[in-house]
């Protein structure tokens, strides 16, 4: 009898502590941007708040899995889906690169929209991942910066990707890159990627540098990912150009931001709606872009970010207004026209 009891205790203990090859995603926090952003060395003392929203991600144990199965807005993801095969340390590092790029784009868009001078310089692309079938596996590493392909430089990662996609399968390709401050080059082959296009098999994101006379400082240690771009941009614009724009309201939202002010899709938006509603937000900005053809073919019932956010809001019966946006200007216009 004692042995049975002890075994039961051991199993219970293991259920809570032994990690499985899965992660769980839960509603995270909805934080006041003033905690992590300072613009022009001036405090934002206006009533209300802009909030950026996070999704909580952690290694799953058996106990976590049971909790996730029983709890709304809690998802189970495989380790491959979540980290792309990267270690936890690499995964956090990758998300910090996303955050850095997001902050630079937010500075650029926020100040540019406010009519301030700012220069955005494209330095290349950070290497985030290298696929197992890439001929650059073992050569390129996370945080290396690709600066040229076949001795050609580019003005954006899109231009680089388009060029590489245009090469023929099996073609030789020369990649110039920076590693630990040293310029190096390596040759490999064009391969077929998972999406059927030609490429070199690396995950990447823009590496940029911004220069402005307006000091902007972020304090986001321990926070990663690109999804706060819209709200960072909006906060910068407001403090510089229109301090009363939010008019005392708590305004939350999510979405990436690019150099043209477009708002990009993000993951886990249903959980972000839940987190924002818990913190009393009156407005939630959601990206409103069409579902891609590939996604529509794979999942005919797929919804875009805005539709998913609306559905989540209805489920939790919140009065928070879900507002669709495609650009930073859409968000600004909504706040101006709905004071």
Label the model's feature ranges.
Residues 33, 48-52, 57-122:
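Extended, small/polar residue-biased N-terminal targeting/export presequences
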Residues 111, 136, 143-146, 150, ...:
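Terminal peptide-recognition signature
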Residues 136-159, 276, 280-293:
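Conserved PDZ fold ligand-binding element
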Residues 180-234:
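C-terminal, low-ordered peptide segments at domain boundaries
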């Amino acid at each position: 009898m004692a042995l049975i009891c002890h075994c039961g205790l051991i199993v219970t203990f293991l259920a809570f502590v032994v990690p499985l090859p899965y992660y769980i995603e839960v509603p995270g926090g909805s934080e006041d941007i003033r905690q992590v952003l300072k613009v022009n060395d001036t405090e934002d003392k206006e009533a209300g708040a802009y909030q950026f929203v996070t999704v909580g991600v952690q290694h799953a144990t058996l106990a976590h899995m049971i909790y996730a199965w029983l709890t709304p807005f809690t998802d189970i993801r495989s380790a491959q889906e979540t980290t792309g095969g990267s270690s936890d340390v690499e995964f956090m590092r990758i998300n910090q690169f996303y955050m850095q790029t997001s902050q630079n784009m937010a500075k650029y868009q926020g100040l540019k929209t406010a009519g301030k001078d700012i220069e955005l310089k494209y330095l290349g692309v950070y290497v985030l991942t290298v696929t197992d079938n890439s001929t650059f596996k073992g050569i390129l590493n996370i945080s290396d910066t690709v600066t040229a392909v076949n001795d050609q430089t580019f003005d954006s990662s899109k231009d680089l990707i388009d060029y590489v996609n245009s090469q023929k399968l099996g073609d030789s390709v020369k990649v110039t890159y920076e590693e630990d401050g040293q310029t190096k080059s390596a040759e490999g082959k064009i391969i077929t990627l998972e999406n059927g296009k030609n490429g070199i098999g690396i995950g990447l994101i823009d590496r940029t540098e911004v220069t402005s006379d307006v000091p902007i400082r972020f304090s986001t240690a321990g926070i990663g990912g690109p999804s706060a771009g819209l709200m960072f941009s909006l906060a910068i614009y407001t403090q510089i150009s229109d301090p009363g724009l939010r008019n005392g309201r708590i305004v939350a939202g999510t979405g990436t931001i690019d150099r043209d002010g477009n708002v990009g899709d993000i993951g886990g938006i249903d959980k972000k709606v839940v987190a924002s509603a818990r913190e009393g937000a009156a407005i939630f900005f959601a990206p409103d872009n069409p579902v891609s053809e590939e996604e529509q073919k794979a999942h005919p019932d797929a919804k875009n970010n805005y539709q998913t956010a609306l559905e989540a809001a209805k489920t939790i019966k919140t009065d928070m207004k879900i507002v669709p946006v495609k650009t930073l200007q859409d968000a600004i216009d909504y706040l101006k026209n709905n004071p």
